[in-house]
Amino acid sequence: MKVVFLDNTDQVAQWVSGYIIWKINSFKPTISRPFLLGLPTGSSPIKTYKNLIKLYQDGQVSFKYVVIFTMDEYIGISSDDPTSYCKFLHDNFIDHIDIAQENVNFLNGNVTDLNYECERYEKKIKSYGNIHLFIGGVGKDGHVAFNEPGSSFNSRTRVKNLSRETRLSNARFFSYKIEAVPKFALTIGLATLLESQEIIIIATGQDKAAAVQAAIEGSVNHTWPISCLQFHPKTTLICDELSTVELKIKTVKYFQELEVNNNKIFN
């Protein structure tokens, strides 16, 4: 696992957006060979999306031959509801770039057969091959997408019961009314995520510090879903200063020295 320590959320967003653009442009996607990008919702990526829109407007990247898969969606909320992840991504990113709508893939939490929807999503990903780059966030309890503590590392896209802690955290998007937050959601599984060629996890804010500590210094443990990323050959955890307060000083220094040495080699 690679860990990048930055000072604040602005620097995190600049790093992540710059890396996404570099990956797309280096890949040189075409209509027959698109770049497969996994994206999250929530508060963590908002600044990253703003940066990506600005860079697109400046002509530094095109999303014409990019195919997007999202991580999760609530069950029982319509796609045009302001609290739906579909609506969120359209408002904050999709509607501002040159991507074809048929290249944007969402889970549908309003279908009659939810299990079939999960199978359909897995097959759709497989029809393209493995996702080239999956961007994600992490919850303060270590959940990734809606893979709550206790999730199997072999899990696939499925229906997931949301914990009270997750619903309390997400209540800010529902006028701070926990009773308005759905109790169930569709989510990609941890195994689905781990099949991606590369993963970047954004961790910002002191409330993510315990999860960051578990991901970097802790053992692989299903009570901290983020720890599964220790199995992945190419994962980068991007942290602001506040999210690192639970780490040992020697851990921070170790990864900072690695990053300095990497920069010397590759620059």
Swiss-Prot record:
Superkingdom classification of source: Bacteria
Residues spanning the membrane: none
Gene Ontology CC terms, in alphabetical order: cytoplasm
Pathway(s) where this gene product acts: Amino-sugar metabolism; N-acetylneuraminate degradation; D-fructose 6-phosphate from N-acetylneuraminate: step 5/5
UniProt entry keywords in alphabetical sequence: Carbohydrate metabolism, Hydrolase
EC numbers, comma separated: 3.5.99.6
Reactions performed catalytically: alpha-D-glucosamine 6-phosphate + H2O = beta-D-fructose 6-phosphate + NH4(+)
Positions of the catalytic residues: 72 (proton acceptor), 141 (for ring-opening step), 143 (proton acceptor), 148 (for ring-opening step)
PROSITE patterns according to UniProt: GLC_GALNAC_ISOMERASE
Molecular function via GO: glucosamine-6-phosphate deaminase activity; identical protein binding
Keyword Hydrolase: yes
Top-tier EC class: hydrolase
CDD domains registered for this protein in UniProt: GlcN6P_deaminase
Record has Hydrolase as a keyword: yes
Any one GO biological process: N-acetylneuraminate catabolic process
Assembly information from the UniProt record: Homohexamer.
Assigned protein family: Belongs to the glucosamine/galactosamine-6-phosphate isomerase family. NagB subfamily.
Function: Catalyzes the reversible isomerization-deamination of glucosamine 6-phosphate (GlcN6P) to form fructose 6-phosphate (Fru6P) and ammonium ion.
Protein name per the record: Glucosamine-6-phosphate deaminase
Gene name in the database record: nagB
